[in-house]
Amino acid sequence: MDKLKISANGPLNGEITVSGAKNAALPLMCAGLLTSGTLRLKNVPMLADVKTTQKLLQGMGARVLTDNISEFEINGGTVNNTCAPYELVRTMRASILVLGPTLARFGEAQVSLPGGCAIGSRPVDQHLKGLEAMGAEIVIEHGYVKAKGKLKGTRVAMDVVTVGGTENLLMAATLAEGTTVLENCAIEPEVVDLAECLVKMGAKISGIGTSTMIVEGVDELHGCEHSVVPDRIEAGTFLCAVAITGGRVVLRNAAPKTMEVVLDKLVEAGAVIEAGDDWIAIDMRQRPKAVDIRTVVHPGFPTDMQAQFMALNAVAEGSCRVVETIFENRFMHVPELNRMGANITTEGNTAFVQGVERLSGAVVKATDLRASASLVIAGLAARGETVVEQIYHLDRGYENIEKKLGSVGAKIERVSG
């Protein structure tokens, strides 16, 4: 199993190109099921989850071609199977996103519940409740969501803000009979990106980027060409890496307007930030200052950046509080950071961080995707060597992270075994 070996190597300097957003690419790939035409996607990150989605769509009969660099062609005209099996779904929660488009186009769908998916901690109940409101008959049997029925437009008010639920119901509504009003929608940039692609495919959607979207169903959608929005979380991760090591790095193919709160927090921590339409520059010449963090839904501070800022705060001047309001049990990186010498205590959904002068390298285990990133960031500023194990988590969301960081001066290498 691969590991990352990391040692401090001074300030980072240079340029990094940001990949397309995984959290946008996965629903966009699933949108290919809505049409018999060809959906051409550009700026797609070549990640483990993207490859799993490719296998899932191919298993349903879709024709999926890729240049293995950043482009995909998905043709749903050959789909001959409306079942998404456990073998593929178990590794990736986003697989549930085939439910809405498959049901809407074919009138039936069977999708395995994602592995470890408690209808509690990260629920799919809002997806199912919304589809039932649109006329679907749904049963959960033998670990599968089995849905059938012709969808009809209606008013759907989601009980909580859910990105996946919004995306699933939005895709389903494009082919439903009549008008669907989706209320309490997530407004993340990745949701907006999906909606804009659906419009290119012939969907009639108003209210994009707001909490209420109105979808007028059409008989069929057609193919189109679409470029995936840049990954704001990958960009934020690299910015935190520079903030902890010092230096000056320019991010290309970035989308600063999608991550303004993160940029504001970096400025508060002492970084100098410049930005244009598609680039961000960070210049850090001092020890970071501790900054309080409270995760909330977009456009607030993203939960997916909480762990990276925890690493930054661990070596910052002063103390701070980090409050996690989105997901439970999302402080699993704290014990690993403490093994490196951090001074972090937790109480419920709040972490109290007292900055230390320097961390020390250690063997640490990645427990999830963003926790992995926080350990990499910590290792870049730690005394001695840090070894991050179980980096398959990291590969789910970061494309060649060791090569990108290495290109700006980080001492980081991937090793097997």
Swiss-Prot record:
Cell wall biogenesis/degradation among keywords: yes
Enzyme Commission identifier(s): 2.5.1.7
GO cellular component term, pick one: cytoplasm
Protein localization: Cytoplasm
Catalysed transformations (reactions): phosphoenolpyruvate + UDP-N-acetyl-alpha-D-glucosamine = UDP-N-acetyl-3-O-(1-carboxyvinyl)-alpha-D-glucosamine + phosphate
One Pfam family, short name: EPSP_synthase
Pathway(s) the chain acts in: Cell wall biogenesis; peptidoglycan biosynthesis
Source organism superkingdom: Bacteria
Entry annotation: catalytic residues: 117
Tagged with keyword Cell membrane: no
GO biological process: cell division; cell wall organization; peptidoglycan biosynthetic process; regulation of cell shape; UDP-N-acetylgalactosamine biosynthetic process
Top EC category: transferase
Residues the record lists as binding phosphoenolpyruvate: 22-23
Binding sites annotated in the UniProt record for UDP-N-acetyl-alpha-D-glucosamine: 93, 122-126, 304, 326
UniProt modified residues of type 2-(S-cysteinyl)pyruvic acid O-phosphothioketal: 117
Molecular function GO terms recorded: UDP-N-acetylglucosamine 1-carboxyvinyltransferase activity
Keywords annotated in UniProt: Cell cycle, Cell division, Cell shape, Cell wall biogenesis/degradation, Cytoplasm, Peptidoglycan synthesis, Pyruvate, Transferase
Matching InterPro entries: Enolpyruvate_Tfrase_dom (IPR001986), Enolpyruvate_Tfrase_sf (IPR036968), MurA_subfamily (IPR050068), RNA3'P_cycl/enolpyr_Trfase_a/b (IPR013792), UDP_GlcNAc_COvinyl_MurA (IPR005750)
UniProt similarity note: Belongs to the EPSP synthase family. MurA subfamily.
NCBIfam families tied to this protein: murA, PRK09369.1
Physiological role: Cell wall formation. Adds enolpyruvyl to UDP-N-acetylglucosamine.
Protein name per UniProt: UDP-N-acetylglucosamine 1-carboxyvinyltransferase
Species name: Neisseria meningitidis serogroup C / serotype 2a (strain ATCC 700532 / DSM 15464 / FAM18)
Upper taxonomic lineage: Bacteria, Pseudomonadati, Pseudomonadota, Betaproteobacteria, Neisseriales
